[in-house]
Amino acid sequence: NFYHIDRVLEAMHEAGIAVIVGTPTYAVPAWLAAKHPDILVTTVAGQQKYGPRQIMDIVNPTFRRYAEKIIRTLMAHVQHHPAIIGWQLDNETKHYDNIGRYMQEGFVRSLQEKYPDLRQLNHDFGLDYWSNRIDRWQDFPPVENTINASLACAFSRYQRQQVTEYLAWQAAIVREYAQPHQFVTHNFDFEWRGYSYGVQPRVDHFAAAQALDIAGVDIYHPSQAHLTGREIAFGGAITRSLKPGQNYFVLETQAQGFAQWTPFPGQLRLQAFSHIASGAAMVSYWHWHSIHNAFETYWKGLLSHDFSRNPTWQEATTIGADFARLSPQLAELKAENDVALLISNEAMDALNHFLPGDARGNIYNDIFRRFHDALYDHNISLDIIHDVNEETSRYRVLIVPGLYAADEGLLTRINDYIARGGRALIGFKSGFSDENVKVRSSAQPGVLRQSCGVSYSQFTLPEETTVSSCCAEIDCRNDNQAELWMELLTPDDGTRTLLRYQHPAWGEYAAATEADYGQGRALYVGFLPQKGLISQLFDVLTADLTLNSRTSAYRYPLVVKKMRNRAGNNIHFLFNYSGEAMDVVSETLGTALLSGETVYVGQPLRLRAWEFTIIES
């Protein structure tokens, strides 16, 4: 029964509103779960009971059969409607911690293909430990209770691969019906801690995006006095890199949202243009009006429950008007960053499998956010990448936080990048284990010792430990706490010690070092620094470089972004991420797009609370 879909499509078309239709596979109906209860996903907590959305087993053949049927039926019904410009695959797809029969059987088959000889599997994964050795494939144990990080991380990688396959499967069906002018997209999301927090552990965004024409994303974040723009920045940097050279769609972001998110005046505009400044070509809200029942009753939309106009809706109308007016200048913006940050789902899995001390949760994302946010606050604009290859040579600086698990090829490419003139800021635990989470038997940081010029064999937890500067360029008296982990570093001959531990037992060891390697330079940090110290280390590493990514001499809460538009002009965004007015001077000559006035270098500018300006030069 497509009555409501037809009604909405006709209303949108009559109003001149374009439509993206989503495949309806992320929430199974009650009758289907009752008829085929095996389609409900099994996790370590057991088979899920019907109620929430996204509790289906995406590799279950019965679920796939019904999913294909509804996709094809829907597509055949609406494919020619003139309002439709594109198709969204599913919704924030993940594997939902699936450990069910079909997932585990598929995993074992994948290992059989990779390891015709079980002895090699046992060797690579170290399965002799605690008698975990597997001598016959039919003896392969359930994966969910394994004590072996190599096996657990391999299964996690396989689970992510099934998300990639599932989205590609849907895309192939949709493209059988899609018109030539219609695109295929998907709304990726991130690790959730009440808002978008970090790299998504359950999806390989870079692999899954290959099935799409345009990458899409959902970004939610703290608001009111806690609004920083950091989530918009990292979310945009990841999504911008999924389809290189293309812009992306913000398919969901908050309008009013939760009660604690109700935006202060001006914040909705600030958020929307921050998305544009990261490379978004669309900003759309979840959702239009606030719903009156069920789980998301208090996840409010642009309109409140009374459907009447309100300040958030009114502010959104100004955003739409400015988007329409300024599209010639702001459409198809491109980043020209020369700083990149490397992320890895495999390193995340491995690092989180061995939590130090009393650490809990996804510490990889804590580390990622510490490095990203430090540079964001420092007005260093960056791209986020997932590999180092020939394309990486266009970046002058590479940030490598927590690359705990990596094959020798990736680490060698990092060394080669440095040798050819690159600068690298490499974080603790990088290079420690191979791609199978087997710790390297060489001096650490393994292959990276060659470029970093430092080694260690011991490490501990930084209890009552600070660091002190060994060079005039660093003043860490206000940011001297060593956190989470500390490696007892010994510099090679010719390697400079930048920081040293302040502790009665560990004072002889370096905490951060810098070494020349080939034509480049590597800075290695053996602990988790505070944000202010990370920015100082970055400045030391890049002191003699003029970086396009260094967008301003100002610091957070004045956030400055720079993009290139299709006319070849620079677009400078100056965002005041604070509740107080800010007086600055212009760092560029150009035209203020919102007012049309000419702005001169050195001209005083006042930005009210949560206000921004855009200058074309």
What are these regions (language model features)?
Residues 1-45, 170-178:
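Aromatic-lined substrate-binding rim segments of carbohydrate-active enzymes
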Residues 140, 168, 180, 209-617:
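Carbohydrate-binding surfaces of carbohydrate-active enzymes
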Residues 18, 183, 423:
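Short glycine-centered segments of the SAM/dcSAM-binding site in methyltransferase folds
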